[in-house]
From Swiss-Prot:
Organism, as annotated: Pseudomonas paraeruginosa (strain DSM 24068 / PA7) (Pseudomonas aeruginosa (strain PA7))
Protein name: UPF0260 protein PSPA7_4092
Disulfide bonds: none
Residues annotated as signal peptide: none
Protein family (similarity comment): Belongs to the UPF0260 family.
């Protein structure tokens, strides 16, 4: 009987992941592509339902991932070197969970094998977002959905 091999996210640090492993940690929820507002008084970060103009509002995937920085210069590119800053990410985020030494949830595609499960479980905001091109920036605070952290 062959020994059971632990999944890569349990036996490697973020810095040890190859590019494919790193990219596969993304569960496709799209939450990191939502516009966020910071409270000037206490520094709290709040997520809105307002999505980046490149985010597909149904699939929660970037419509131009390869060239996203060209079209959205302030797009956040997550890297292993930033792991100590991941607390602004949703508590369900694979990058944040692995950085914190925790396991991926049962609905994560690497665990269950179904990339649609993130939508079926309503972890993503699929179908509940608005494009930033539809809402004036001054009105974003009307669309807060949760506080990060």
């Amino acid at each position: 009987m062959a020994a059971k091999v632990e999944p890569f996210w349990k036996r490697k640090t973020l810095a040890q992941l190859d590019q494919d492993e790193w990219e596969s940690l993304c569960d496709g929820c799209g939450l990191c592509c939502l516009q966020k507002l910071e409270d000037e008084d206490d520094g709290s970060v709040y997520y809105t339902r307002i999505a980046c103009k490149l985010l597909d509002l149904q699939t929660c995937r970037c419509t131009n991932y390869a060239e996203r920085i060209r079209f959205v210069p302030d797009c956040i590119q997550l890297t292993p070197a930033q792991a100590d800053e991941f607390q602004w990410l949703p508590p369900t985020c694979g990058y944040r969970l692995v950085a914190e030494g925790r396991d991926l949830p049962l609905w994560h595609h690497l665990v269950c094998g179904d990339p649609e499960q993130v939508h079926k479980e309503r972890i993503s905001q699929s179908g509940r977002m608005l494009s930033e091109s539809q809402v004036a920036e001054d009105d974003w605070e009307d669309y807060l959905i949760f506080r990060a952290g």
